[in-house]
Each structure stands twice: as structure tokens, then as C-alpha cells.
């Protein structure tokens, strides 16, 4: 068995959830001694794609009569691996599949999603190919808290005070930074705490409304693009709180990494898979920005109990070896059907 693991965006986009998912898949295959390649011209038994931008490459593989697998809904915070669109109609928020993503998914032989609700959503929105739930694995050794050299990277790079608590929020630099005030209001009320908002900032650079919000934020609230993998991991290892303030479904793989880093999760209800989390057990989940702000403040003030241990136990179930075996079983079943 040899697998094509394909995700090759432009270098400026090869650093976020898509790149980390590619590394995770390759790592899982290595653990179970399964060969892989990144060269589409090689010989292989099955091809695994993860970006709706790669439809042309998928077509090349299909012409060779090779089975195709597509991973979807694992990296929705990354523009390169985003399958969903959002719009408002009559005051209601509507989630749809990108037209090119839907077209690509319906060319695949098998689609892998991280949760049951994701599978149900794809089916309800026009995907007619087989879909399996396959939760991405996590290399827990990459989040080893005893590695002080990696923890130091964040402080050396951003020159922050080690004695201050750190809150990291992941989101999008969309039109008006929807949901961002859940974080900003917490930063206003806790000037002694350092806050970082992380996301793909290309849109914000040209958007006046986003730039105004950023400009008027308190000094302890920092807005950055996606840092390199080692620095981002160092941020997580030092973070007291990991927030998802946005309304959009967020990046599943980023949530897994926050769980593996022993961050306290404080997330918006619409941003996460409901079957993965239980409020007050392995995360704090809220629908409204005011509640998210209050939860963040209460946690920083030690008024509510951490759910970190239960979150870590949950993510520990999804090892690279388990993920690799699940991938291999799906590949073999697909080849047998073909």
C-alpha cells in the first residue's frame, strides 16, 4: 500500500491547518509502516486530498483510475482548506458548501469528516458520495510540557512577560471580526493579562472596519497572522485559555491541538462539533459573546473549575496509531470496492 498525501498550496499559505493535517496524516502512516508520497506523478494505490483548491489535481488522479479520498471540515480556519461559506438571509446565518468544494466532493470515492454532525451536514447539502467519520489523530509528543526550549520560543519571539497570564483566540479577520468583542471586552477588563488573536490576516489588511476595530483595541490585545508551526505550538503551550469567539465552524485540528496543550477551552457553541464537547466537562461552551467574556474572566479569576484534564483525556484517545489504522482500513475498503 502506498498513499498520495497531497496538499501543496503557495508557500505563503503552507503553514496553517492544511499543513498540520498533512503532517498528521503522514505521521500516522509512518507509525503503521505505510508508504506515502507527495508526488502526484508517482505510483500509488490511493490518493488523499484535503483542499477544495486541488480539484484539477484530483481530476488527474481520477483519469488514472486511482481511488480518491478527500478530508473535509477539519481545517475551516485555514482559507486553503475551507469547504464552507457563510451568508445572512432575513437576519439568519446560513452555512453552505462552497460550489467548487461541493463539485470536488462529489468526484471523490470517499470523504472523511471529523464528526457525525459534519457528515449529516454534507449529506443535507448535496454530497452524494460515501462519507465516514474519521477523527484526526494528534502527536501528543509534540506538546510535551517538559520541553522548556519550546515553551521559551513564544517569549523570545514576541518579547512578552512570562509572569502574565496568556489568552489565545483563534478566528478570522472577516468583514467586522464577528465575535471578536468577546475577547476584546475581556482584555479591557483584565489589562494585566496578555491577549492574542490569531488568524489569516490577508483580508484585514484591506478592510477598513477590521482595521478600525484593531486600532481601537486595548494595548494588551494583540492581533497577528498565523505564526510558524513551532512558534504557534509554543503559544499554545504557554496559554492559560484558548478561545473560539467566532460564529463560524472552526478548525477541528486547531481545537485538538489546544486540547493537547492543556489550554482551557472557552468556545462559541456554533464553532465546535457538539459530540466532541460537553459544557463544563471538557470545555466551557456559550452562545453569546457576553457569556464568553464572563467565562474567560471567571476562569482567569479562578472562579470556575478547569476542564483541562478531561479535555486531555479525550484527545488522548485519538493517537497517531489509531488514526493511521483507521485511515488504512478506509483505504483498503475503498480499494476493495473499486
Provide a role label for each language-model segment.
Residues 264-267:
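Short hydrophobic beta-strand element within catalytic cores of glycosyltransferases
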Residues 104-130, 138-142, 179:
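A short, active-site helix/loop in glycosyltransferases that binds the activated sugar's phosphate group
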Residues 170, 194-209, 225:
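Glycosyltransferase donor-sugar binding loop
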Amino acid at each position: 500500500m502506498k498513499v498520495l498525501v497531497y496538499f501543496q498550496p503557495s508557500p505563503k499559505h503552507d503553514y496553517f491547518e492544511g499543513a498540520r493535517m498533512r503532517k498528521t496524516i503522514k505521521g500516522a502512516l509512518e507509525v503503521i509502516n505505510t508508504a506515502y508520497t507527495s508526488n502526484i506523478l508517482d505510483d500509488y494505490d490511493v490518493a488523499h486530498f484535503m483542499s477544495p483548491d486541488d480539484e484539477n489535481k484530483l481530476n488527474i488522479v481520477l483519469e488514472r483510475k486511482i481511488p480518491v479520498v478527500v478530508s473535509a471540515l477539519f481545517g475551516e480556519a485555514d482559507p486553503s482548506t475551507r469547504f464552507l461559506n457563510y451568508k445572512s438571509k432575513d437576519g439568519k446565518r446560513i452555512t453552505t458548501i462552497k460550489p467548487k468544494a461541493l463539485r470536488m466532493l462529489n468526484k471523490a470515492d470517499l470523504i472523511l469528516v471529523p464528526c457525525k454532525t459534519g457528515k449529516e451536514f454534507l449529506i443535507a447539502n448535496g454530497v452524494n458520495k460515501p462519507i465516514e467519520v474519521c477523527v484526526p489523530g494528534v502527536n501528543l509528543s509534540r506538546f510535551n510540557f517538559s520541553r522548556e526550549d519550546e515553551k521559551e520560543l513564544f517569549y523570545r519571539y514576541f518579547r512578552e512577560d512570562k509572569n502574565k497570564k496568556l489568552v489565545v483566540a483563534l478566528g478570522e479577520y472577516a468583514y467586522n471580526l464577528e465575535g471578536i468583542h468577546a475577547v476584546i471586552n475581556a482584555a479591557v477588563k483584565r489589562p494585566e493579562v496578555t491577549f492574542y488573536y490569531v488568524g489569516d490576516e490577508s483580508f484585514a489588511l484591506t478592510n477598513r472596519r477590521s482595521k478600525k476595530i484593531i486600532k481601537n483595541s486595548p494595548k494588551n490585545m494583540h492581533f497577528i497572522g498565523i505564526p510558524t508551526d513551532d512558534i504557534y505550538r509554543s503559544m499554545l503551550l504557554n496559554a492559560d485559555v484558548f478561545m473560539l469567539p467566532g460564529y463560524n465552524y472552526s478548525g477541528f485540528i486547531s481545537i485538538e491541538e489546544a486540547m493537547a496543550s492543556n489550554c482551557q477551552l472557552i468556545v462559541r457553541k456554533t464553532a465546535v462539533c457538539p459530540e466532541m464537547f460537553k459544557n463544563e466537562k471538557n470545555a466551557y461552551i456559550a452562545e453569546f459573546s457576553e457569556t464568553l467574556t464572563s467565562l474567560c474572566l471567571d476562569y482567569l479569576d479562578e472562579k470556575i473549575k478547569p476542564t483541562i484534564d478531561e479535555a486531555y483525556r479525550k484527545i488522548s484517545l485519538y493517537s497517531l496509531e489509531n488514526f493511521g489504522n483507521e485511515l488504512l482500513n478506509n483505504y483498503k475498503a475503498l480499494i476493495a470496492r473499486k
